[in-house]
Swiss-Prot record:
Keyword Cell division attributed: no
Gene Ontology biological-process entries: mitochondrial translation
GO molecular function ontology, one term from the record: structural constituent of ribosome
Cited PANTHER family: MITOCHONDRIAL 28S RIBOSOMAL PROTEIN S24, SMALL RIBOSOMAL SUBUNIT PROTEIN US3M
Superkingdom of the source species: Eukaryota
Entry protein name: Small ribosomal subunit protein uS3m
Example of a GO cellular component annotation carried by this entry: mitochondrial inner membrane
Transit peptide: 1-35
Length: 167
């Protein structure tokens, strides 16, 4: 009996102390740690893995052997809204992947010129022409109304995925 009374008293003292410390209730994190380190390049296999030109070169070759996949002035010194443009880029890429499911042959290139957004992509010839034209018009119209600026899709069709080399 005396033991339970002392434990109860200890618990009340801990609660009293934690109420005095601001933020003491929010310091315990119970989520699992996910510390994965991965290089942003394709792993070398047995020579049977097809890769595109963008995937074949490591990220440190940007502006030397390969170009940027998002062209805008948001990252220049003194420019605002770089984070918003990055989120817009992620949304546009996911929108295009969902609108053309399994039809994109390579990465999408996003270009911002003044008040216009240009989306350039290689598309596989898996859809009939009338469905393809409908999806292009649907995407341009919906994105133009959403971003309140002209959005143009510049798409090229290819018969199969373009393979640069096998790794």
């Amino acid at each position: 009996m005396a033991w339970s009374a002392s434990v109860r008293g200890l618990g009340q003292r801990v609660l009293a102390c934690s109420r005095e410390l601001p933020g003491a209730w929010r310091t315990l994190h119970t989520s699992a740690v996910c510390a994965k380190n991965r290089a942003a390049r394709v792993r070398v296999a047995k020579g049977n893995k097809p890769v595109s030109y963008e995937e074949a070169h490591a990220p440190h070759y940007i502006a030397h052997r390969k170009g940027w996949l998002s062209l805008h002035t948001g990252n220049l010194d003194g420019e605002d809204h770089a984070a918003e443009r990055t989120l817009e880029d992620v949304f546009l890429r996911k929108f295009m992947m969902g609108t053309f499911p399994g039809c994109l042959a390579d990465q999408i290139v996003l270009k911002r010129r003044a008040n216009q957004v240009d989306i350039c992509a290689l598309v596989l010839r898996q859809l009939p022409a009338h469905k393809f034209y409908f999806l292009v018009g649907y995407s341009e119209t919906l994105l133009s109304h959403f971003y309140k600026c002209p959005v143009r899709l510049h798409l090229q069709t290819v018969p199969s995925k373009v393979v640069y080399k096998y790794i």
